[in-house]
Amino acid sequence: MTRSITINIAIYEDKTMKIEKLIGDCLREKGRTLAIAESCTGGLICDRITDVPGSSDYFMGGMVNYSNESKSKHIGVPSNDIKKYGAVSSQVAKRMAQGVRRAFNTTFGLSTTGVAGPTGGTKRSPIGRVFIGFADGKKTWVRKLDLKGSRREIKRKTVEISLELFSEILTHKNFSRKKVEPKG
C-alpha cells in the first residue's frame, strides 16, 4: 500500500534553517559527499546547495546535462537507454544519478530529467513529467512526478521536492514507501 505525504513547497521559507543547510550539515556530519546531474532544472539544485557557506566540504560538483549527447558523453548514460526509454524516464534518471556519482567519486549522486514545458510534451512524457534519481553506490532510488504549472513553477517544484526527498534519504526516513503529491 502506498502512503501519501504532502510537501509544502514553502515549508523551509519561514524557518531559521533552510533545507539546503540541513542537507549540508547532515552530509558534513556523516563525512559524505554529493554530485548533481541536472537536466530539466538547469542547475537550480546546484545553486541552492552552493548557497550554503562551506558547501565545498561536501558538494563536489554538478553538471547540466540538457542534451541527450551530454547525458551519454559526460555521465555515461547509454544512448540505447535514451532511445529505448526516452530521455525523460526512470531508467535515464537512474543512470544519470549513478553516472554523476561515479564522475565525481562521491557518496551520493542526484539527478533530474523532465519536461518543464510549455512545449516538448508527448504522450509518453507529458509536460510536467519529471524523474528524480538518487544513487549511493549500493542503492538507486527514482521518484516520478507529474507536476502542474508554468515552466518556472515546474522547475521550482522539482528543486524543492528533490531537496526534500534527498533529506529523507540522508535521515533514513521511509522514502521508498511514500508517494509525493506536491502542493501548488
Give the ranges of each region predicted by the language model.
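Short alpha-helical segments enriched in small residues
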Residues: 7-184
